[in-house]
Amino acid sequence: MKKRMTALLLSACICAGLAGCGTNTPGNNPGHTKTDSSVTSLTDNITVTSVKTDITSFDQLKNGINEFSMNMYSALPADKNIFYSPYSIASALSMLDVGADGATKKELENALGITDLDEWNDEMKAYLSKDWSQNTFVNTANSVWMNKDTSWSADIEKDFLTPAKDYYSGEVYEADFNGQPDKVVQNVNNWVSTNTNKMIPEILKEIPGGTVMMLINAVYFEGKWDTPFTEDKTFQSSFYGTDKESVVDMMHLYGEHFTYMDNGEIKGITLPYDGDNVVMKVFMPTADDGDINELFDKLSNEEKQKLIDSLDNANNVEIDTLQLPKFTDEQSIDGLDEILQNMGIRSAYSDSADFSKIADGIAVSSVNHRAKVIVDENGTKAAAETDIMVKETAMMPSEETYNFIVDKPFVYVIEDQSTGMILFMGRVNSL
């Protein structure tokens, strides 16, 4: 027998931190987060299989997340700064998919580009267990928080909790949402803080009314430049934004070699991070009076991806002057609902939503996302947060040198080149 639920909160955060429960990464602190008497860990009670060792390709995961990223980019305002993590949003929706069935599950998987669910889950599981270097890494952690007074589906452990732990390395906690809500909030915030190295110390002030479950995903990226900038070569200069000219701190490198491309309309550069195949790719208009928004936005998803990929086979040339702004950008995407529904995720919002692997009578009410990036002389840190609220329903080489002066709007991605997967994507129109 399943008890009808009033709300289900699923929250995914990508945030700056060094600890995670699913990755073997420098700075990681695997294991259970310390909790008090209001919370009981059920993690060890759930048996999962070992990670598959024969996975050498992440093609489905890469293709799905990258296509999802391009769809997101096209749906966001063209006149503003944007920054988001398709990896975060797709991971959150994949967690949601674990509990979905029927048409709801089909729509989620179509939007994510899942063609073989077992393969997708195996690739996700293997990616979460990927080894990273000391200086450049991605951490991922997941947890499930369940109200102890709620009656769940009789098969929730087999159908939902075990796959969540198996594929997403999720810790599972039972908590007293009703009797000790303040302590539960404190424990949840402590978990997030611990698993983000205190970069996100709080996500809850109170448990939203009627909430019976919280799924929390934390992902953190940190990368130190392979060729770092130095503070003595950082000085103020103009950035010519779409709406105004501003004076910002500009970092400089001189006479260094980078991978560089120019197709006559758009030029790009690859800035590698130390130790792993993670890079930042930056794209600008070739012409001084060019508009990156116009040039990039007119491309199809396939053409955008080809542009990004073209840097992988481009020439390594000497860049006489590389000028990159030192910046912090934090963006919110409130109400992804319309975007996601336009991507085909519709029944999840309706009375006919099918999340029966968790409980009957629940549906998504809203999806929100915010992300933050810090770029300085040492490297990059990136953070993001996604929350899904679910409520009750009634149901070539050259001797020439080049300059790359980033003093006007640009598009950039942070990409794991070992898989080709876009972890973060953004555009800066103004600073």
Region roles according to the model:
Residues 102-108, 289-292, 331-333, 383, ...:
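Extracytoplasmic/secreted cell-surface and envelope-processing proteins
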Residues 8, 12, 33-46, 361, ...:
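Non-catalytic interaction/Regulatory regions outside core domains
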